[in-house]
Amino acid sequence: MIKTTLLFFATALCEIIGCFLPWLWLKRNASIWLLLPAGISLALFVWLLTLHPAASGRVYAAYGGVYVCTALMWLRVVDGVKLSLYDWTGALIALCGMLIIVAGWGRA
């Protein structure tokens, strides 16, 4: 389960970077060349999703919980926003949901 969780975090990071770089280009007038690493990051994101040993719908559902946590870490580290009690609570609930789904992969 630890390997799966780490893979989910790597997947989420690739997705966030792949979306953040075009956002920088569009909102902050950054270089259009950021679209190249953004495309590579999103392609890596898609490839990483294929490495999970479950049906795609289960993978996407479980991945959503980790994505929430990763996005909140991004909010704190990159955007410099202090997380609220609601952020922490939501992340904990999302992560619990992911763990429940992943724990049932072999039983479904």
From Swiss-Prot:
Q: Which GO terms describe its cellular component?
A: plasma membrane
- Give its localization: Cell inner membrane
Superkingdom, natural source:
Bacteria
* Membrane spanning residue stretches: 6-26, 31-51, 61-81, 85-105
Write down the membrane topology: Multi-pass membrane protein
User: Which UniProt key words apply to this protein?
Assistant: Cell inner membrane, Cell membrane, Membrane, Transmembrane, Transmembrane helix
Q: Which SUPFAM superfamilies match?
A: Multidrug resistance efflux transporter EmrE
Provide Periplasmic-side residue ranges.
Answer: 1-5, 52-60, 106-108
Pfam families reported for this sequence: UPF0060
What does the sequence similarity comment in the record state about its family? Answer: Belongs to the UPF0060 family.
Name the record gives this protein: UPF0060 membrane protein YnfA
**Which species is listed as the source?**
Escherichia coli O17:K52:H18 (strain UMN026 / ExPEC)
- The gene for this chain is ynfA
